[in-house]
Amino acid sequence: MPRSMKNDNFIDKTFTVMADLILKLLPGVSSEQKKAFAYYRDGMAAQSEGEYAEALENYREALALEQGEEDRSYILYNMGLIYQSNGELDKALEYYHQALELNPRLCSALNNIAVLLHHKGELSLQAGDEETAEALFNEAAQYWIRAIRIAPNNYIEAQNWLKTTGRANLEVY
């Protein structure tokens, strides 16, 4: 039974019923698109409950069915979030990059890549590898700059870090 049918949360049930009604009423929505959306919705529900293996399984099914690049980018992004939560940072980076290939303006993916690169830079610094740390910090800065160009009112902490480290070669401030 799909997760959406097992949910005891009234708001989630209401959303599920409304989404199903909208999908039934929209002309031109194929059964494949409906299935992809159901898997994606179930993946999000499982992810929000910390059921990451189930969420990944649903996202993989959604990815196999979904044709739209933007929708695929969000599926890949959510898979990246799960791998990041599990501490699989390199795998998370792979999924964020795949999401960006499909949707270059996906600010949350740009930000998360920057966060992970910055974290890796901090680890390199702690290990005494200043050269690698500096390269990772510079790469993180480039992703934050891209995100800030798209959404100048977001990522205030990143903007402050860019300014304080002298990496703010950007005219959005």
Curated annotation (Swiss-Prot):
Its main location: membrane. GO terms for cellular component: plasma membrane-derived thylakoid membrane. It is found in: Cellular thylakoid membrane. It comes from the Bacteria. The keyword Cell membrane does not apply. Pfam families: TPR_1, TPR_8. It is a peripheral membrane protein. One of its GO terms (biological process) is photosynthesis. Essential for the assembly of the photosystem I (PSI) complex. May act as a chaperone-like factor to guide the assembly of the PSI subunits. This is Photosystem I assembly protein Ycf3. It comes from Synechococcus sp. (strain JA-2-3B'a(2-13)). The lineage of its organism: Bacteria, Bacillati, Cyanobacteriota, Cyanophyceae, Synechococcales.
